C-alpha cells in the first residue's frame, strides 16, 4: 500500500522542499536501507554521510540539514525530525495497517464486576479480574492479566504477557519460616501508559502501586509492591525496581538497572544501563554505577585491586603525612 506525500504533510505539517506532494510513499524506512518510494528521517547530524548516500524518496530533516538534504533530493524540514518521525509512524499505523476493533475477544475472561470501556480492546486469552477497570481506547494485547481491583487509565497499551496485580513479595520471618503478608492494595495505571511484553507490576501491600500518566515501560521489567513511578518516566528492558521505591517524573532508567527498595529518585534523574542504585538520589542529573567491561584477565586484576582500595587509601594518607613531616623538618632546618 502507498500514500501520497501530501497526505502526510496535510496531517503532520512541515515544509516540503524540492519535492512533489503527489509523490507516492510506500513505507517509512531507515536512511541506510531506504529506497525509491520510502520516507526516511535524519535526527542526528552524526549520520549526515548516510543522508548523502540515501536513496529515500524524501527525508525528514532539521533546518540545519536543509541545504545538505536539498542537494540530495526532496526533504521535509521541521524543528524536531525525531518527533515528526514518531508521529509519522502513528499516522501510518492508523491509516495503512489494520487495527483490532474495540471490544472483548471471545477467548478473553472478564469478571462480571469489571468495568471495561466500550472503546477499549481486550485481546485473545486476556483475563480481567473482579473489580478491575479498563479506560477508554486502551488496548490489551493477548494474554494480559489484570488482577482484582487494579485500574488502567485511558489510551494505554499493554503488550502480550503483562501481569498487573500479582502479589507483592512480602513475608515475615517467624521461627525459621516465612509468614505470608497478604497484599491488600491494588495497582493504578494512569493515562497514556505503555507497558512492554512480560512486564510485571505487583499490587501494593496496603496502598496501591502507582504508575502515573505517560510512563513508558519496556519488556521484562519488574515493579515491586508499593512502588510509585512519576509522570513520563521511561524504563528500558529488564529493569528491576524493588518495593516501596519512589521514582520521580521525567526520569529514565537504562536497561538492566536495579533500584533498591525504599529509595527515592528526584524528578529528571537519569540512570545508566546496568547501574545498581543503592541510595536515594535527591538531585536531577545522570548517574552511573557499574564496573566497565574488559578482558577477563584485566578485569580480575582490577577487581582484586578494588578490594584493596580502603587499605591503599590509608597507606597513601600515611605516606602523605610522612612527606609533609619531612618537608616541615627540612624547612625548619634551613631557617
From Swiss-Prot:
GO terms for cellular component: membrane. InterPro entries: Hexapep, Hexapep_transf_CS, LpxD, Trimer_LpxA-like_sf, UDP_GlcNAc_AcTrfase_non-rep. Homotrimer. The keyword Hydrolase does not apply. Pathway: Bacterial outer membrane biogenesis; LPS lipid A biosynthesis. Catalyzes the N-acylation of UDP-3-O-acylglucosamine using 3-hydroxyacyl-ACP as the acyl donor. Is involved in the biosynthesis of lipid A, a phosphorylated glycolipid that anchors the lipopolysaccharide to the outer membrane of the cell. It is an enzyme of class 2 (transferase). Belongs to the transferase hexapeptide repeat family. LpxD subfamily. Keywords: Acyltransferase, Lipid A biosynthesis, Lipid biosynthesis, Lipid metabolism, Repeat, Transferase. Its EC number is 2.3.1.191. It catalyses: a UDP-3-O-[(3R)-3-hydroxyacyl]-alpha-D-glucosamine + a (3R)-hydroxyacyl-[ACP] = a UDP-2-N,3-O-bis[(3R)-3-hydroxyacyl]-alpha-D-glucosamine + holo-[ACP] + H(+). It comes from the Bacteria. Gene3D superfamilies: 1.20.5.170, Hexapeptide repeat proteins, MurE/MurF, N-terminal domain. GO terms for molecular function: N-acyltransferase activity. It comes from Delftia acidovorans (strain DSM 14801 / SPH-1). The active site is at residue 225. This is UDP-3-O-acylglucosamine N-acyltransferase. GO terms for biological process: lipid A biosynthetic process.
